[in-house]
C-alpha cells in the first residue's frame, strides 16, 4: 500500500519522498518496540503520517513551523520531510522521545531544530504572530 495518498502525489512530486517516508515508518516501528512513541495497539501508524502530509500540503511556502509536543514527530518531522522549504522546530519534553527525533532527523538528513522543553517553562518565546493549527 502506498504511503503517499494519490491525491497528494501532485502536491509532493519528489520520487524520493515515498522511500523516505517508509524509512521513517520503519524507524518508528523499530523504536516503538523499546519506547512508547505511538500506541502499541495502533494497527495503522501510517494514518498519522498521512494526516501530517495533508497538514504539510496547506502550509504557506517558506514559513516556520513549531510543533509543540511533537512526540513521534507528527506532524513536524513529516512536514520537514515533505516540505524542505519550511523551517521546522520540534518541541518535546520527554528525553527518550527526543532521542528518537534526533535519530530520525539524522538518518533522514533533516535540518530540524529540536528543543527538549515544556512550553510552560517559558523557554519558548514567540517573536511574531502565528497561525495555530491544533490536533488530538
Question: Where are each of the predicted segments found?
Answer:
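Conserved SAM/SAH cofactor-binding pocket of Class I
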Residues: 53-136
Amino acid at each position: 500500500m502506498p504511503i503517499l495518498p494519490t491525491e497528494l502525489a501532485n502536491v509532493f512530486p519528489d520520487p524520493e519522498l515515498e522511500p523516505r517516508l517508509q524509512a521513517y515508518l520503519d524507524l518508528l516501528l523499530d523504536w516503538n518496540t523499546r519506547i512508547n512513541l505511538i500506541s502499541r495497539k495502533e494497527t495503522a501508524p501510517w494514518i498519522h503520517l498521512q494526516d501530517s502530509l495533508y497538514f504539510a500540503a496547506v502550509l504557506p511556502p517558506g514559513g516556520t513551523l513549531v510543533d509543540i509536543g511533537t512526540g513521534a514527530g507528527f506532524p513536524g518531522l513529516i512536514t520537514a520531510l515533505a516540505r524542505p522549504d519550511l523551517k521546522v522546530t520540534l518541541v518535546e519534553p520527554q528525553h527518550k522521545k527526543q532521542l528518537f527525533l534526533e535519530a530520525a532527523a539524522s538518518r533522514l538528513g533533516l535540518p530540524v531544530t529540536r528543543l527538549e522543553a515544556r512550553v510552560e517553562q517559558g523557554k519558548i518565546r514567540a517573536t511574531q504572530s502565528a497561525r495555530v493549527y491544533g490536533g488530538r
